């Protein structure tokens, strides 16, 4: 399974190989550093949130310059969709962590994915993190320690038929033990750890240390001890050579008590050591309104008819009265972090001002119930779907005038970028990646205070713009030109990779090809 990233061109070494007469005898083909990208989600197979999209997109553009392999747990839903999987190695267990095999599959576009094959831990119904009743797996500490230990062993040259990376890139708490296991195993390969959401820390009891085969030093405050528990996330922060977050503003915010989730001290230390930076996410090249096959009709900044066709579809699909006032959209998990309660609080004022509201997503039961009740009280003005469907979401982005994102915090956010691509202006709280990707009054609307009144003021500004068609269209055009695709935003990662590799002794840079 796989897909191609638009705009991939033949790299110079491949051209020279295809035409030997062009190859000068003194010019050997360029060597490519090997990168191991460790993740718990890959949207080709399994996706819970933005990590799955990130893990599918970034390695694909990185492999233009590097030799990249993704390492992923062999979940049941992954194995069911794999073709031509072959076993390339095996790794022993440690303490209560069972042994595993390493499988390799090459996706249709050439991306190589290694799977940690451990049926005891991964072949289950449910999501990567929860059972089908929504409860965390009680052995998550073992499940993801197995992933991290496998990554560390591969970094040390074991388990992958001699394939050894020159750099390891781990992501979020499920793979955060990777840099720590590397350090404890004496593997000096450089490591990068990306924080996608600091609030999810991978906590377990101190007594789990024996099951995880941890050394005594792991129990220190300088390593992964966190208020009497063990934190996978803190282990990644403490032991990785460099830390990134998914936006520049979020990188600053998490060094403060307000946003640091108790880890602001160690993160401030990383800033002082110049080991923490923010890189804004890009988006997949498929988000192109002029050629998106999911849409009812395609459109561009020069031709709006297709956008109106998507609006009519959304109106009919959600039972809204046609063409009466601006259409506001919520495309989000229905959880407190996303500020859904604030949207409910201002909804009556929004509707009284002539607005209409459509929502798609699922989340906390009380917020799902409140959204359904809002739709029941306002038929023709509010439409709600509990659940998520990619095609419906894209049509809502395309058909709406404004996207509501009153997030309490937002490490990066992708919805505002998708909305901008499709000419829907985001209305968002000025935090994290929202602050980095929205220009207030130009490509969307920002508000600062975490209050319903501040939020409502921004909504009313948007309604005023809606009633000025020339200004609305000008903002739409600027918004559609604003988002960066991964093909544009990959270079900061390339620079960081090169710096980490350059600052490591040549003998420790791993095998290259």
UniProtKB/Swiss-Prot annotation:
Reaction catalysis annotation: [(1->4)-alpha-D-glucosyl](n) + ADP-alpha-D-glucose = [(1->4)-alpha-D-glucosyl](n+1) + ADP + H(+)
EC number from the UniProt entry: 2.4.1.21
EC class name: transferase
Domain of life, source organism: Bacteria
One term of GO molecular function: alpha-1,4-glucan glucosyltransferase (ADP-glucose donor) activity
Binding site residues for ADP-alpha-D-glucose: 47
Coiled coil residues, start to end: none
InterPro entries: Glyco_trans_1, GS/SS, Starch_synth_cat_dom
Keyword line: Glycogen biosynthesis, Glycosyltransferase, Transferase
This protein's pathway: Glycan biosynthesis; glycogen biosynthesis
Entries under CDD domains matching the protein: GT5_Glycogen_synthase_DULL1-like
Any one biological process term the GO annotation gives: glycogen biosynthetic process
One matching Pfam family: Glyco_transf_5
Record family assignment: Belongs to the glycosyltransferase 1 family. Bacterial/plant glycogen synthase subfamily.
Family matches, as NCBIfam families: glgA, PRK00654.1-2, PRK00654.1-5
Function field: Synthesizes alpha-1,4-glucan chains using ADP-glucose.
Protein name: Glycogen synthase
Source organism per UniProt: Pseudomonas aeruginosa (strain ATCC 15692 / DSM 22644 / CIP 104116 / JCM 14847 / LMG 12228 / 1C / PRS 101 / PAO1)
Gene expressing this chain: glgA
């Amino acid at each position: 399974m796989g897909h191609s990233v638009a705009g991939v061109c033949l790299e110079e070494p491949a051209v020279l190989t295809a035409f030997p007469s062009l190859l000068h005898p003194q010019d050997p083909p360029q060597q490519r550093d090997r990168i191991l990208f460790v993740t718990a989600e890959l949207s080709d197979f399994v996706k819970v949130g933005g990590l799955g999209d990130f893990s599918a997109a970034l390695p694909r553009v990185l492999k233009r310059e590097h030799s990249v392999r993704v390492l992923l747990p062999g979940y049941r839903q992954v194995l069911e969709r794999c073709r031509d999987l072959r076993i390339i190695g095996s790794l022993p267990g440690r303490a209560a962590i069972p042994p595993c095999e390493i499988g390799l599959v090459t996706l249709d576009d050439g991306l190589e994915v290694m799977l940690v094959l451990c049926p005891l831990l991964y072949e289950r119904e449910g999501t990567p993190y929860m059972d089908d009743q929504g409860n965390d797996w009680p052995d998550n500490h073992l499940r993801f320690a197995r992933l991290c230990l496998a990554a560390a062993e591969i970094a040390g040259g074991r388990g992958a038929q001699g394939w050894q990376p020159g750099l390891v890139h781990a992501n979020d708490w499920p793979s955060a033990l990777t840099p720590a296991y590397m350090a404890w195993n004496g593997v000096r390969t450089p490591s990068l750890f990306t924080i996608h959401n600091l609030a999810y820390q991978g906590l377990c009891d101190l007594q789990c240390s024996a099951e995880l085969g941890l050394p005594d030093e792991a129990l220190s405050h300088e390593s992964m001890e966190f208020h009497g528990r063990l934190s996978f996330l803190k282990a990644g922060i403490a032991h990785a050579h460099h830390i990134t977050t998914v936006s520049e503003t979020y990188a600053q915010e998490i060094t403060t008590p307000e946003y640091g989730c108790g880890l602001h001290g160690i993160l401030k230390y990383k800033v002082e050591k110049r080991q923490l930076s923010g890189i804004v996410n890009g988006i997949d090249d498929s988000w192109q309104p002029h050629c998106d096959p999911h849409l009812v009709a395609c459109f561009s900044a020069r031709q709006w008819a297709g956008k109106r066709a998507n609006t009519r579809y959304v109106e009919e699909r959600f039972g809204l009265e046609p063409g009466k006032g601006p259409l506001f959209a919520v495309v989000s998990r229905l959880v407190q972090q996303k500020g859904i309660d604030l949207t409910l609080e201002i909804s009556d004022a929004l509707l009284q001002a002539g607005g209409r509201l459509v929502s798609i997503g699922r989340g906390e039961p009380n917020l799902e119930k409140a959204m359904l009740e809002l739709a029941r009280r306002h038929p023709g003005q509010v439409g709600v779907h509990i659940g998520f469907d990619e095609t419906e979401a894209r049509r809502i982005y395309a058909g709406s005038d404004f996207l509501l994102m009153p997030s309490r915090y937002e490490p990066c956010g992708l919805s505002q970028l998708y909305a901008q691509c499709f000419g829907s202006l985001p209305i968002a709280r000025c935090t994290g990646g929202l602050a980095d990707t929205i220009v207030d009054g130009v490509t969307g609307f920002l508000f600062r205070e975490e209050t319903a009144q501040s939020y409502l003021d921004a909504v009313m500004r948007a309604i005023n713009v809606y009633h000025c068609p020339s200004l609305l269209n000008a903002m739409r055009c600027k918004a559609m030109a604003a988002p960066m695709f991964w093909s544009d935003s990959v270079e900061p990662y390339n620079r960081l990779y090169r710096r980490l590799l350059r600052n490591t002794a040549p003998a420790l840079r791993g095998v290259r090809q």
